[in-house]
Amino acid sequence: TTEVWGSSDKLKHYVNKYHPDYVFVCLGANELFVRDIITKRSRYVDNMLNQIGNIPYVWIGPPNWKKDTGINRLIASKAKPGCFFLSDGMKFDRSKDGAHPTRKSSALWMDSVARWVVLHSAHPIRLKTPMPGNAKANRVEVLQPKR
């Protein structure tokens, strides 16, 4: 959540460790129904964006399955112009829990994000379509907010 990541300096730790050229953030789905979210979460979003600093970034909004209480509005108001991708309004096939997009739907979601980054983001990057059967990461490291 923005609260977990934004109440620590772990994002800055990862920035210093990996020296990324570009940062993608995808948080907020567990905060769709937080009441008074702007008051409760603004400082955490601010802290995360301060830790990213001047590195180009895109914050990918949550894949809403119901109307949220303001998480998308909060992130959009804090992110620099062209750095927030609004996922709300997209149609997703959902897993059995009714909330998480299926793997296939998640892949289509990220395809939409990729097209948007190339054409509309504040920091477009060149992306090549992966060859079928070759669309697997060589290495995956899950970054956790707690030490």
Predicted regions and their residues:
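Short, conserved loop/helix-junction motifs that constitute active-site signature segments
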Residues: 17-18, 49-54
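Extracellular serine-dependent O-acyl
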Residues: 57-61, 68-99, 104-144
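Hydrophobic/aromatic residues located in beta-strands of well-ordered beta-sheets
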Residues: 23, 56-57
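Conserved SGNH/GDSL esterase-like catalytic core that processes O-acyl groups on lipids
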Residues: 1-43, 64-70
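Contiguous hydrophobic segments
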Residues: 34-48, 91-103
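Extracytoplasmic/secreted envelope proteins and their assembly/folding machinery
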Residues: 8-12, 42-49, 72, 76, ...
